[in-house]
Amino acid sequence: MTNNNAAKPMAKSKITTIRPKNFDDDAKVIADCLREDIPVIIDLEHTSPEHARRIIDFALGTTYAIDGDVQQVNDSVFVCTPKTVMVIANKEEPKQERDFSWLTRKM
């Protein structure tokens, strides 16, 4: 007799980290991952403000189109998630409004 209630191994979850260098290549990777329900961490620490603005604008549009979300982790790191993934913030800190003002500073 087969036990249908036996624990089954879960598929491994994936998450991708992008440190943008080339808009065309990196934007495609971000979109492809999100379309495949893979969350993306975008690290803009070493990205020019102009390039960072384009990447974040693209990521915001992509996540909106798939009913996903973008959360800012710190000044230069963002987490983009498909609708199948929920980011739970530290309950001790109130949820902050999105502040992308650093993207608009002049070079």
Regions found by a protein language model. Give the residues of each.
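Positively charged, small/polar-rich N-terminal and surface patches that mediate targeting and assembly
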Residues: 1-40, 45, 60, 64, ...
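Short, solvent-exposed loop/turn segments at secondary-structure junctions
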Residues: 49-51
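Acidic, glycine/polar-enriched metal-coordinating patches/loops
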Residues: 55
